[in-house]
């Protein structure tokens, strides 16, 4: 999970820059981001002595690592240094997994997300967030089509009545149907709700299609607000055993 964690360090800095009014601090943050990214590129990628990004994680085919795409695109936008965009392009070329090309599957709609080799919902959504950012810079309509198809397929097969996904832990599992089956297990992760709302927000900003806003509203008022703990409840680890 090293690359996954590094992604959020970089995103945290990147989004903070947008609201930071201290110009000296902003320059310092950009320098830190560049050092962070340069170190990653020295160790990860194609070439002798480097590790393929999909092999930097032992789970989910490396989808979690590939989701670092988004901050590399944003760093390119901050610096105009093409090496960061090139690294982003390398990540896209992997298809976001060592043994299944998510990009091509969504571009051509050959399978639904719950039918993919790896079905971890949050991480998969994060990869397509990055792909949308990459599209905004590159302009290749195939990338936008793949993101739109991904979202449409999630809405068709893995979007529940309350506006979340995954009735098997944190995995896509055709939950549009599976939600009708009784279960007292862990399901419909709030991280999935929030990440999908983020992706829908970005897709609306790019396309202007108001249908994405409708789904944001559904997820927000139901899955997200319903998950807020306003009664100071405690929980036994991740087993879902809740008491006051």
Where are these regions (language model features)?
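Glycan-recognition and catalytic cores of secretory/periplasmic carbohydrate-active enzymes
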Residues: 1-244
């Amino acid at each position: 999970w090293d690359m996954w964690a590094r992604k959020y360090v970089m995103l945290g800095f990147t989004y903070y820059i947008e609201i930071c009014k201290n110009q000296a601090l902003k320059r310092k943050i950009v320098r830190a981001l560049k050092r962070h990214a340069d170190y990653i590129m020295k160790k990860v990628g194609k070439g002798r002595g480097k590790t393929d990004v999909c092999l930097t994680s032992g789970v989910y085919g490396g989808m979690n690592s590939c989701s670092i795409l988004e901050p590399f695109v944003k760093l390119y936008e901050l610096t105009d240094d093409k090496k960061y965009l090139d690294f982003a392009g390398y990540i896209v070329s992997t298809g976001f997994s060592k043994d299944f090309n998510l990009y091509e599957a969504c571009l051509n709609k050959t399978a639904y997300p719950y039918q993919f080799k790896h079905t971890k919902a949050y991480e998969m959504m994060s990869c397509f967030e990055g792909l949308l950012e990459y599209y905004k810079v590159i302009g290749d309509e195939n990338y936008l089509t793949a993101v739109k198809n991904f979202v449409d397929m999630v809405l068709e097969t893995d979007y529940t009545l309350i506006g979340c996904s995954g009735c098997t832990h944190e995995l896509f599992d055709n939950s549009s149907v599976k939600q009708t089956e009784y279960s007292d297990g862990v399901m419909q992760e709030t991280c999935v709700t929030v990440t999908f709302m983020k992706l829908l927000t970005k897709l609306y900003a790019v396309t202007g299609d108001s249908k994405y806003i409708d789904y944001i509203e559904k997820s927000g008022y139901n899955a997200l607000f319903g998950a807020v703990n306003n009664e100071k409840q405690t929980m036994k680890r991740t087993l879902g055993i809740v008491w006051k």
